């Protein structure tokens, strides 16, 4: 049964690689790990890389790669191309690069970092830590109790589930949207941020000029006249509608 499953998996990956080669016109390598902890490295072309049972290190290079972590605690480093990266069953670390990457967590408590590209980042089923990079990123907190940090760009942060989510803005003006959980928003960054809380009992720490929806139950505002005051000074508590 195991051999038949392995043959099916290998055939499936080869079929995906054939689709990628047909779409790109470039040769794609198929790199598959085994039950050990492997170092799996792609090529400058469009690759398919699949981790297996070990704690793998996966290095995608310059192509538009398709990467899937396996059952171990894997570390994935996307390359300079526009990569699609998916976490596996373990607590994985997924890191983007210069390309506009699509990265999604798996079953574990994953750490996903967008780095230098314009990235689409989505949490998985675990309690994930989601971080954008220096560009404008879109971040979705998914099924776990996630921690979302926009990074340096003008980012869009969303919650998609009933779980509680921590949102952190950055000094570039972000849009943050909660869902059904009891979410916490921290946007004291000296820029104009947009906060949409959604359902649940939500808490917002905002600057005086941030635009905070009336469905946010608890809002703490502070007048900011310089960035030096973002973490210092007295707080003012403002209820919705005031």
What annotation goes with each model-predicted range?
Residues 2-13:
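Bacterial N-terminal signal peptides that target proteins for export
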Residues 37, 46, 55, 64, ...:
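Consensus positions within tandem repeat domains that build extended binding/scaffold surfaces
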Residues 187-230:
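Leucine-rich solenoid repeat scaffolds
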Residues 33, 42, 51, 60, ...:
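Glycine-centered beta-turn/loop sites at beta-strand termini
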Residues 63, 149-150, 174-183, 196-203, ...:
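Beta-strand repeat architectures
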Residues 2-4, 21, 27:
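Charge-rich, low-hydrophobicity low-complexity segments
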Residues 26-66, 229-237, 241:
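N-terminal segments that cap or nucleate solenoid repeat domains
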Residues 11-22:
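Bacterial N-terminal signal peptides
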């Amino acid at each position: 049964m195991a051999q038949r499953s392995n043959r099916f998996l290998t055939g499936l990956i080869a079929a995906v690689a054939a689709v990628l080669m047909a779409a790109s016109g470039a040769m794609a390598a198929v790199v598959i790990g085994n039950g050990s902890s492997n170092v799996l490295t792609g090529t400058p072309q469009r690759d398919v890389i699949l981790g297996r049972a070990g704690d793998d290190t996966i290095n995608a290079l310059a192509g538009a790669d398709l990467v899937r972590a396996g059952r171990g605690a894997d570390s994935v480093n996307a390359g300079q191309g526009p990569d699609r990266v998916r976490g596996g069953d373990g607590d994985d670390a997924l890191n983007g690069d210069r390309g506009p990457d699509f990265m999604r967590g798996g079953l574990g408590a994953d750490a996903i970092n967008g780095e230098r590209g314009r990235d689409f980042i989505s949490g998985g089923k675990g309690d994930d830590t989601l971080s954008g990079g220096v560009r404008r990123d879109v971040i979705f907190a998914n099924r776990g109790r996630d921690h979302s940090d926009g990074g340096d760009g003008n980012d869009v942060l969303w919650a998609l589930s009933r779980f509680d989510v921590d949102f952190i803005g950055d000094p570039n003006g972000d849009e943050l949207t909660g869902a059904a959980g009891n979410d916490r928003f921290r946007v004291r960054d000296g820029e104009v941020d947009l906060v949409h809380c959604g359902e649940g009992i939500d808490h917002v720490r905002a600057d005086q000029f941030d635009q905070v929806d009336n469905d946010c139950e608890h809002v703490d505002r502070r007048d900011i006249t310089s960035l030096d005051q973002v973490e210092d000074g007295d707080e003012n508590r403002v209820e919705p509608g005031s």
